[in-house]
């Protein structure tokens, strides 16, 4: 260790060495020896106890080719059976055909067994257990939803729910919903059952009007209740516009009527015999949980199939 005392000792040794050489008559040789000793002492000090400024420069300067470099840990590519979302997810807008809709497409390989890590948009439960809240809709939440005064339900008749759900990553996450006040408690019961059954949900978030009307990328997968929009392909209000219907994992549970498939890239999930996580299936937990509160399922429709859709009226 190079201390101030050590430096003084080194200087004393240098003076002593120089003096001894002068007494020997070799003044020049003594000076050279002193210089060598001084350089050695200073080199030892700088390498053993660099100043904070020098240390900072050493850390921030480019490393030598053989030195290890520090780097941040990347986001996990896999958690349990779930993987990170493809970088292109939600970015590739589909072309719209003459009928004003995008054509159904083959499911990309990355989404044929879709199990994506959930990105927390609300704080997850600290204890990993089920929790839920029901309250009047805060003004800021209403403002970022699709609700307007033209919707068929008053804002005072809606409730804001936070609900814990199980992700495809096996973790507990917190989602949010807008729902009609008269079904809010029933929905808490349903999602509590799904959580207890480890039924996975990818995302549960309130959509804005802009999000609902955005050009389709065909790969969305948001579970939600309220959406102020008409019935698909019709002018009348959807049950979602009243807060009386749930779309559950739309990608794993697509809508199909003739050639129309929504989401458009979810065609792999039209094969209901190929059971995969997150799918609503007859006589299984998701369908049973909604049936227990008296709700119907779009998978039972005859003229079309709407596997994601559960509603209080059955329509």
Can you describe what each PLM-predicted range is?
Residues 28-32, 39-140:
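N-terminal low-complexity, Pro/Thr-rich disordered segments
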Residues 134, 165-169, 191-198, 230, ...:
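Sec/Tat-exported extracytoplasmic proteins
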Residues 86-111, 230-315:
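Catalytic cores and adjacent binding grooves of peptidoglycan-active enzymes
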Residues 113-118, 132-169:
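Basic/polar, acidic-poor N-terminal "presequence/leader" segments
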